[in-house]
């Protein structure tokens, strides 16, 4: 049977021209009847070349890089899984630090250089046994399991607890529980009890056993409600700053005001920075347009002793009070143009 084999090449294979030739030679020695295809990772992932799913018995990955640089993306791993047939193999230069991704994509790790696409196992569903029927004289009867019957407690027998088994006696704990329930009913606190047992209440009790909610509200009005004091001074003026334990809401108002001021300042600074950037760009553009060009006469050395020749500031011969910081005549007395000045 012909085996379909795919050579999946990493782009760095071009660094060694003998790698692919050696792999093909090994394949020809180990396989008698095979059909070999070859492509690169980038062409496969970009869709430049397409293969049918479940079309390859083996995919060989060639990556000459070191182990820490052999990572395979999940998208490529899933694509390789789809191209392999059932029980197909993915071999070659595989990464060793992606075991979780390999298992999540459906592969089984056989060894360090081989992953396998397993064949799914058939699931076995256990069917429920149907109810048996007996036929007697064309009369069909279905055998059904009977459930135990329980006796419901009546209001007349509320003083004694109802038992499902007449042979069981009444324990001390059950007696105490029944007496506590009876006390709750007498004190009209059943409405507030969190007992989920509906045996004692079957919906037939009168409304007198329940407490009216309006009565509870009326009773709560008797208690004095604590109202927080306003942050006001004795003279009637309002406080400029909230107290340490403020409860009137002034502290929250101050915090909101501080936040609004901060946002306003951030907006102003951002606008200023933006305008400064725009102005700097305009200045730079103007400087590029107005280029300063010096002639040969401007670039030649200036002799301050010759009449008509002056420095850039034109004040070198007037004295130190008029000379620049880097003037070579600093410290010398004033001189006239044409006068010989020597600097020792």
Swiss-Prot record:
Binding residues for [2Fe-2S] cluster: 231, 243, 246, 248
Annotated binding of [4Fe-4S] cluster, by residue: 313, 316, 324, 327
Residue segments, region N-terminal SAM-like domain: 1-160
Polar residues bias (residue ranges): 155-170
One Gene Ontology cellular component: mitochondrial intermembrane space
Required cofactor(s): [2Fe-2S] cluster; [4Fe-4S] cluster
Location of the region described as Fe-S binding site B in the Swiss-Prot/TrEMBL record: 313-327
Keywords in alphabetical order: 2Fe-2S, 4Fe-4S, Cytoplasm, Iron, Iron-sulfur, Metal-binding, Mitochondrion
Chain positions covered by the region annotation Linker: 161-223
Motif (Cx2C motif 2) on chain: 324-327
Subcellular location: Cytoplasm; Mitochondrion intermembrane space
Region (Fe-S binding site A): 231-248
InterPro entries: Anamorsin (IPR007785), CIAPIN1 (IPR046408), Dre2_N (IPR031838)
Any one GO BP annotation for this protein: iron-sulfur cluster assembly
Function as written in the Swiss-Prot or TrEMBL entry: Component of the cytosolic iron-sulfur (Fe-S) protein assembly (CIA) machinery required for the maturation of extramitochondrial Fe-S proteins. Part of an electron transfer chain functioning in an early step of cytosolic Fe-S biogenesis, facilitating the de novo assembly of a [4Fe-4S] cluster on the scaffold complex CFD1-NBP35. Electrons are transferred to DRE2 from NADPH via the FAD- and FMN-containing protein TAH18.
Family of the protein in this entry: Belongs to the anamorsin family.
Name of this protein: Fe-S cluster assembly protein DRE2
């Amino acid at each position: 049977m012909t085996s379909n084999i795919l050579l999946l090449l990493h782009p760095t294979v071009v660094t060694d021209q003998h790698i692919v030739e050696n792999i093909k030679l090994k394949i020809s020695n180990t396989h008698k009847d095979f059909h070999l295809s070859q492509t690169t990772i980038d062409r496969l992932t970009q869709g430049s070349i397409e293969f049918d799913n479940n079309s390859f018995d083996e995919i060989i990955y060639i990556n000459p890089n070191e182990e820490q640089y052999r990572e395979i993306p999940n998208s490529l791993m899933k694509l390789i899984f789809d191209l392999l047939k059932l029980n197909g193999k993915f071999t070659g230069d595989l990464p060793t630090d992606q075991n979780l991704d390999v298992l999540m994509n459906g592969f089984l790790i056989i060894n360090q250089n081989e992953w396998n696409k397993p064949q799914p196992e058939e699931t076995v569903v256990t069917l429920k046994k149907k109810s048996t029927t007996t036929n007697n004289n064309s009369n069909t009867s279905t055998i059904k399991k009977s459930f135990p019957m329980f006796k419901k407690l009546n209001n007349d027998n509320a003083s004694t607890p109802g038992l499902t088994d007449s042979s069981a006696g009444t324990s001390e704990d059950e007696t105490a529980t029944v007496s506590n329930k009876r006390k709750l009913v007498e004190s009209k606190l059943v409405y507030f009890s969190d007992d989920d047992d509906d045996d004692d209440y079957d919906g037939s009790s009168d409304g007198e056993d329940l407490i009216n909610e309006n009565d509870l509200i009326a009773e709560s009005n008797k208690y004095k409600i604590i109202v927080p004091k306003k942050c006001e001074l004795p003279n009637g003026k309002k406080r400029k700053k909230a107290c340490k334990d403020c409860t009137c809401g002034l502290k929250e108002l101050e915090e909101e005001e501080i936040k609004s001021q901060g946002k306003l300042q951030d907006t102003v600074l951002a606008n200023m920075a933006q305008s400064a950037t725009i102005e700097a760009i305009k200045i730079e553009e103007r400087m590029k347009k107005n280029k300063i060009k010096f002639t040969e006469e401007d670039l030649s050395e200036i002799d301050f002793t010759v009449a008509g020749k002056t420095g850039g500031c034109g004040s070198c011969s007037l004295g130190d009070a008029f000379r620049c910081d880097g003037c070579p005549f600093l410290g010398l007395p004033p001189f006239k143009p044409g006068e010989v000045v020597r600097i020792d």
